[in-house]
A protein has these predicted regions:
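Short, high-confidence coil segments that cap the C-terminus of an alpha-helix
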Residues: 61-62
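Single conserved hydrophobic/aromatic residue that forms the stacking wall/gate
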Residues: 1-9, 13
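A conditional alpha-helix N-cap/helix-loop micro-motif detector
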Residues: 2, 44-47, 95
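Short helix-loop capping/hinge segments that flank enzyme active sites or metal/cofactor-binding pockets
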Residues: 10-55, 71-72, 76-79, 112, ...
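Structural helix-boundary/capping segments
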Residues: 41, 52, 95-97, 102, ...
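Short, surface-exposed loop/helix-turn segments at secondary-structure junctions
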Residues: 74-99
């Protein structure tokens, strides 16, 4: 038995012993990494339908402009227990995993996304938007980002990262 197969067997055991009303981050992670094939297939079917909806959407629109995350850049919480990490959104403490919604918007459907810095917040950290395009249209999102950047011309690397 290899380490990975031992780990997988351990995760399956953990999943089988989860309480049905346990929706903690660890329980969700355990369930999502030990999907039965039929569960994965059902989820993939939903993803395929979503991909077709995006395909129809992009017949009429070139790109989608969306936030990169629910908050501007911030100093990262280094707590090793990710499930305990928190961030502030509009003054309210939220689970750290809320950050992944906007990235997931494009990733779940295999859509390209190019992030464009649009300036600096009051704390001096970058603010940006993402340009989402149709599947296989990476060059279109990159070109759109270049056109916006030519007009805004606002990106300045933070001092510690300037070369």
């Amino acid at each position: 038995s290899t380490l990975s197969s031992s780990s997988a067997a351990s995760d399956v055991y953990k999943r089988q012993n989860l309480d049905s009303d346990d929706f903690s981050d660890l329980a969700r992670l355990t369930r999502n990494t030990t999907l039965l094939h039929r569960e994965w297939f059902t989820a993939n079917e939903r993803r395929t339908k979503l991909r077709w909806e995006w395909h129809e959407f992009f017949k009429e629109y070139d790109v989608v402009l969306a936030p990169v995350a629910s908050v501007c850049a911030f100093p990262h919480d280094q707590n090793p227990k990710i499930s305990e990490r928190l961030l502030k959104v509009n003054g309210e403490k939220r689970p750290y995993n809320d950050l992944f919604f906007w990235a997931g918007l494009s990733c779940v459907s295999y859509l390209p996304s190019t992030v464009l810095p649009t300036g600096l917040g009051n704390d001096g950290l970058p603010i940006g938007i993402q340009v989402i395009g149709a599947e296989m249209q990476d060059l279109k999102t990159i070109r759109f980002e270049q056109l916006i950047d030519e007009q805004l011309n606002v990106f300045v690397p933070p001092e510690k990262y300037a070369v």
